[in-house]
Amino acid sequence: MTIQLIPEKTEFRISTTDLETVYTESNGIKLRLDVQHIDDFKNDTYRDIEIHFLVVAELRCITMNFFDINHQNYAIDGQEFTIDVIDFWEKYGYHPDSGFYQINNSDILISKKSLYDPRNNLDLKHYLINGYDSHIEIIASKYEYRYL
């Protein structure tokens, strides 16, 4: 089965060689990583961000790049765009391939949803954040972010 990735429509693009993850039972997961806003992208600069996943069912930290280990087994929704990345970003307010995805056809959600959310009220999603040499997968309900 081809893994279907849907880019999150965020104002930033993840571009990182380092991911820092902090997990607590009571406060979910906080990720610190490097991103680029459109102006950063134009100037080849980066800024730190913290993404906070509030209700978390599962966290997976894998020390391999997602695209390397799945090189012929994934598809990114919307990758058939034909306009310039900057033009797209300016027009729609988000990067067409943010590096932050939902896995649309998640085997984990299919197999564990009844365990993690038996009442079906958490609206769990399978998120993927790819780093340079690693990636993180998170089963969570929602997230918020702030620049540091």
Sequence positions of predicted segments:
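Surface-exposed, interaction-prone regions used to assemble/regulate multi-protein complexes
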Residues: 1-148
